[in-house]
Amino acid sequence: MRIGIDAHIVLRKHKRYDPRIARYTEQLITNLLATDKKQEHTWVLFFDERMKSTKKFERPNVEIKRFPFIQYRKYLPMVYSHMLISSFLAAARLDVFHSPEGLIPYLYPGKIVTTFHYVPRGKSESNLFVRTFMLGARVAFAQLCKRARRIIVSSEEDKKLLVDRHGYPAERIVVMGIEEAAQGSWARRVKALIKVYKEVAGSAKKNRKKK
């Protein structure tokens, strides 16, 4: 599989930098790479173009890409920003794209897995969440969520919120300990993630065959 992972949040200069999410993202990537000893997959890592050193992530089966003009995104019209990032992702020809920080580029036609570290509890929080964390998209939170084939959350409470408040299908939600990820048990998480990636990529291939 060609698995893309959004890693731009690890840059401290990023305007939405969160040390907790950055640490989770970095650990996610390093553990996925370490587990893939047979190099069965190609890992496409997307960094902020201001990220100077990516040596710790470099492997024979890793492709390093940098989002263009990411620091100027705030000056771009919202739709153009989405188009730019979505076309950049599409050019990578991924089987699945995982955003560990909850970003969903709503113009991207590929298969998306995303991790929500927070689930809005109501409409006002949903609007703020979309504007702040999801590229400033002016679309309903529930509609944006449907672009993701799987959403990873840290608790059953978050899953219930996604289902009851936002109408996201329960069968597409994966409950996985995010907050305690730093304490270990990454082998179990990596195994679960690879299963999710295969399910999403597999469904994509089946849909292409039907067409």
Q: Language-model segments: what does each one mean?
A:
Residues M1-K211:
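Carbohydrate transferase catalytic cores enriched for Leloir-type hexosyltransferases
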